[in-house]
Amino acid sequence: MNTIKTVVFDLGGVLVDLDIDRCTGAFRSLGMDAVADLINPYYPAEMIGRLEHGVISFHEACDEMRRLSGTPEVTDAQIAWAYGQFLVRIPVAKLRQIDALRERGIRTCVLSNNNPASMKYIRRMFTADGKSMDDYFDAVFLSYELHELKPSEAIFR
């Protein structure tokens, strides 16, 4: 008999391999050195924290990044691309492990501090094994949708 009923995964650094140097290099290639200096996967800068908290939209965050770096010509799409460079891959072996848990009757969920732009890239990564993200999880809890950030107690309720 299974005593484990549910496994909750994080995305960045757990399921999704990250490359901070690739991300900061992408921002620097856009002339956004000031933004590159703020990138940290585990301790987001205040502005990125507000984006992940769902307090500001992606467009509003882009406006702040352009102001901060003095690059009004950089588009939202370019910023999304640069931010997406953080996200490398989801190894297929991890997807198969999630499948194995589900085959044993274990519920699988995601709880992640994230933002809408990154989620577009992440959702595509789940298709590497021919499925969608929703095929792997019973529930997906994202900070920007819940308007709460880990590790706050409220996000776990």
Residue map of PLM features:
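N-terminal helical cap/lid subdomain that shapes the substrate entry/recognition surface
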Residues: 2-96, 103-104, 115-116, 142
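Generic structural signal for well-ordered alpha-helices
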Residues: 95-98, 156
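Structured helix-beta-strand junction loops
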Residues: 104-105, 136
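Short beta-strand/turn micro-motifs composed of small residues
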Residues: 112
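Substrate-recognition "cap/lid" segment bordering the active-site pocket of phosphatases
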Residues: 116-157
